[in-house]
From Swiss-Prot:
One of its GO terms (biological process) is envenomation resulting in occlusion of the pore of voltage-gated potassium channel in another organism. This is Crotamine CRO3. PROSITE patterns: MYOTOXINS_1, MYOTOXINS_2. Its main location: secreted. It is found in: Secreted. GO terms for molecular function: potassium channel regulator activity; toxin activity. Disulfide bonds join C25-C57, C32-C51, C39-C58. Keywords: Antimicrobial, Disulfide bond, Ion channel impairing toxin, Myotoxin, Neurotoxin, Potassium channel impairing toxin, Secreted, Signal, Toxin, Voltage-gated potassium channel impairing toxin. It comes from Crotalus durissus terrificus. Belongs to the crotamine-myotoxin family. Monomer. Cationic peptide that possesses multiple functions. It acts as a cell-penetrating peptide (CPP), and as a potent voltage-gated potassium channel (Kv) inhibitor. It exhibits antimicrobial activities, hind limb paralysis, and severe muscle necrosis by a non-enzymatic mechanism. GO terms for cellular component: extracellular region.
Length: 64
């Protein structure tokens, strides 16, 4: 029972820290969006960088 609680706590701890997951993208002032989203203007599309698979980095507020 204790192991289940410990696992749940650690899992939630990792989920609650999304800002630390994509440091390269965030350093450019960006945020990770699904690859299908369009970054506006196109110059705000930083590419994949360190976002997860099939996601890309866009300047914050540009994902539409």
């Amino acid at each position: 029972m204790i192991l289940y609680l410990l696992f749940a706590f650690l899992f939630l701890a990792f989920l609650s820290e999304p800002g630390n997951a994509y440091k390269q993208c965030h350093k450019k002032g960006g945020h990770c969006f699904p690859k299908e989203k369009i970054c506006i203007p196109p110059s705000s599309d930083f590419g994949k960088m360190d976002c997860r698979w099939r996601w890309k980095c866009c300047k914050k507020g540009s994902g539409k």
